[in-house]
Amino acid sequence: MRALVIALLLAVVAVSSGAETIDPAVAALLRAVETSGCQMERNGELHEGKAAADHLRLKLERSGRLGMNADQFIDRVASGSTVSGKPYRVLCPGRAPVDSGAWLRARLAEHGRPG
C-alpha cells in the first residue's frame, strides 16, 4: 500500500511539472508555418507547412522548454539544424528564399510584435 501511495504521489508530481504550456506567440508562429503555403528547407530537403510545423513542435518538446518565448523559440529551435548547424530556409511561391529566423520575425511583426 505504501508503495502505491508513493507511486501515485510521484505521478502527480510528474504530471504537474509537465503542465508547462506553449507560449501563445510560439503557437501563432507554428500555425503560420503550417498554413502559409510556403515550404521549409531543412538540411537540403523541402517540407510542406504541416510537416515543417510538426518538426518544429517536436524540437520544441524535446528541448524540454515548452514555455520559451517567441524570440527564444526562433533562436534556439526554429532557425536551424541542431545536428548539422545549417540554417533553415523558407521558400514561398514567387519570392526569394529567406532564412527561417527572418521569416518568423516578420510574422511576429505582422501581429504587432517587433521581431
Where are each of the predicted segments found?
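Positively charged n-region of N-terminal signal peptides that target proteins for export
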Residues: 1-4
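Compositionally biased, low-complexity intrinsically disordered regions
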Residues: 8-10
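N-terminal signal peptide c-region/cleavage motif recognized by signal peptidases
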Residues: 13-16
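N-terminal secretory signal peptides
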Residues: 18-62
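Compact alpha-helical subdomains of small soluble proteins
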Residues: 43-115
